[in-house]
Amino acid sequence: RDNTIGATPQVNTRHGDWIAFWHERRLGYQLKLAGSRGHSGRLIANGERLLGTLPSFFHGYTPPPSLLHGDLWSGNAGLESGGDPVIYDPAVYYGDREADLAMTELFGGFSQSFYQAYRAEHPLDPGYETRKHLYNLYHVLNHLNLFGGGYGAKAQRMIEHLLAAI
C-alpha cells in the first residue's frame, strides 16, 4: 500500500513492469514534484530525457520483486543492546533488491564486511554499478523536494552521469 518516504507520499500500487514502475512512481513522480516546487530548466528537461532511456539500464536484467526497506541508510539501521541488528523508519515497497543496496552506498555508514557478506550471499548482476545511480537519484530528488539546497546540483550531476552512460 502507499506510504511516505520522509514527508513525501510514496505511491506503491502494484505494477507488472518494474521499469514502468520506476518511471511513473519513483523518478517521474519526484521530477513532477520538483517542477511544481519551482525547480525547472535543465534539471527537469534532462530528467525527462533520462526517463525515456530507462530500458537501456535493464538490458538482460529482470529483477524479481523483493520486499524492500525503501529508505535504508545508516541512520535507519542499528544494533539492539544485545547486538542483534535492527532496521527502522521504513518506506516499504516491492521492487529490485538493488534499490536498497544502492541507498546504503548513497550516504555511507555501512562496513565493508556488510557488502562482502551481502555479495557472497547475493552476487550482484552486471550493470549494478550504473543502476545504483539510477536508484539513488530517486532519493536525491526526494531530498531536493524536502530540503532544497545543493540537492538540485547533485541530482543534475547524477542525471548527466546516467545520460552519458547510455
Question: Can you describe what each PLM-predicted range is?
Answer:
Residues 11-14, 18-23, 32, 61-67, ...:
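Active-site Asp-x-Gly
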Residues 43-65, 160-164:
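Short, intrinsically disordered, low-complexity segments enriched in Ser/Thr and Pro
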Residues 134-143:
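Short helix/strand-capping connector loops at secondary-structure junctions
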Residues 6, 72-74:
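Short, catalytically relevant binding-site loops at active-site mouths
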Residues 2-55:
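Active-site catalytic-loop/activation-segment of kinase and kinase-like phosphoryl-transfer enzymes
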